[in-house]
Amino acid sequence: MLIIDNPQQLREKIKQLKQQGSEIAFVPTMGNLHEGHLTLVQAGQKKAAVVIVSIFINPMQFNNAQDLLNYPKTMAQDCEKLAAAGVNIIFTPAASSIYPNGLNAQTYVEVPLLSNCLEGELRPGHFRGMSTIVNKLFNLVQPDYACFGEKDFQQLAIVKQMVSDLGMPIEIIPVATMREKNGLAMSSRNGKLSSLEKQKAPLLAKVMNQLAVDVQAQKTELSILIDDASIILNNAGFNTDAIHIVDAQTLQAVNCHSKEAVILMAAFLGETRLIDNKVVILNHSATKI
């Protein structure tokens, strides 16, 4: 396994791999890896002979300087996990090599409609930072495939749209959310939960799953279902940040043409913000929206 921190050195290695006819699968991460990330690696290994993982805590997608400072840095442990998983190359650039002129002078990429709604309203600039770094990493790595988790549903939708809009020759591989035995979606943030919070945390997925059943039943207006779900979470000690039920393709309001809806959940448990989502197939014979 190679660990490369220099973009030019990476370019040279990529050129060599391309000359050899090797296909490349790419997994971009910000480190602090868990089993969910390793599932992305496995998905890449099913597609290509060479798997490259980047570990880069991207300052452009943080709109809170303290969050950036506090983000866990576990490089040694991450590299051990990736070596054991059979990753071929780990790319670990410094911010100065990715943004040599600083963030304010950096050209950026933005997918306007998908980036400015839902999570984008709560975190201004976050998705612009995400799409910019993913675009730059795609240019450096030149992958044939790129693997993204479905847990970050809006991020996945934005990356798909960016690749389509810009004509990138990359196949995006969505990978199902990995869950703990209790149903909680795996996340780097779960390690911040106290023992008591870890006992409460699975309720987020349980409420979401019941919400999915109720959405499919189509007997109650979506706004009422959302309010009821928020009350259940708040009464259990969560602080509901946002619950949305939107068209799974457009991320806009569900309408009579929507084939699938996605339930997007975000709630604080103590200081930790947990997210989850679930796609629901719609039957419009009796939809209440």
UniProtKB/Swiss-Prot annotation:
GO terms for cellular component: cytosol. Keywords: ATP-binding, Cytoplasm, Ligase, Nucleotide-binding, Pantothenate biosynthesis. The keyword Transcription does not apply. It is found in: Cytoplasm. Its EC number is 6.3.2.1. The active site is at 37 (proton donor). Signal peptide: none annotated. GO terms for biological process: pantothenate biosynthetic process. It catalyses: (R)-pantoate + beta-alanine + ATP = (R)-pantothenate + AMP + diphosphate + H(+). Gene3D superfamilies: HUPs, Pantoate-beta-alanine ligase, C-terminal domain. Its main location: cytoplasm. ATP binds at residues 30-37, 149-152, 186-189. It is an enzyme of class 6 (ligase). Pathway: Cofactor biosynthesis; (R)-pantothenate biosynthesis; (R)-pantothenate from (R)-pantoate and beta-alanine: step 1/1. Catalyzes the condensation of pantoate with beta-alanine in an ATP-dependent reaction via a pantoyl-adenylate intermediate. Belongs to the pantothenate synthetase family. Homodimer. This is Pantothenate synthetase.
